[in-house]
Amino acid sequence: MLDCSTTCLAIAKEIIQENLKISIITNSLRICNLFHTGSTKVKLVCLGGTLKVRSSSFIGYQTTQALSQYLADKSFMSCPALDIDFGLVDNNLNEGEIRRTYIKQSRKHFVVADNTKFSEAADVIITGFEDIDVVVTNKKLSKKWEQVLQSHDILIDYCE
């Protein structure tokens, strides 16, 4: 599962470049369009619903209902912010609900977020840290952030 973030779009481009045989479930119109022309090995499930033009993503009841019919080994998502007290947070209620459903319908949960997302503000709780398995980020986190994530048994993976 790949969410509608630009980070997951970058992951999708890597999947094409590596020519991986994989199944992908997404609510991202950009990712659907990318695989439409970029890979024949990918089994792609594009979730419909109400199109949110700004993020080129499908949101709403229909999207959540369709997503709830699938089960995935892994979900990859980003979010507008990570709150040290509350976990993953979003600025949009509908997108937050989609991300919660990604977590519910997958076995292992990856949050891919650059260093600017840590301690940002947002007003919709997606989920607490107890539901996250791996955080992938680009720069070393503060000791406080490392302690919080490690206290929830979250693996921290640093990448460039």
What are these regions (language model features)?
Residues 1-17:
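Helix-turn-helix/homeodomain-like alpha-helical modules used for DNA recognition
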Residues 14-19, 35-39:
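Active-site catalytic pocket residues across diverse enzymes, especially alpha/beta-hydrolases
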Residues 2-3, 26, 137:
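Short beta-strand scaffold positions
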Residues 19-24, 131-134:
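Short active-site oxyanion
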Residues 32-160:
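Conserved phosphate- and dinucleotide-binding cores of soluble alpha/beta proteins
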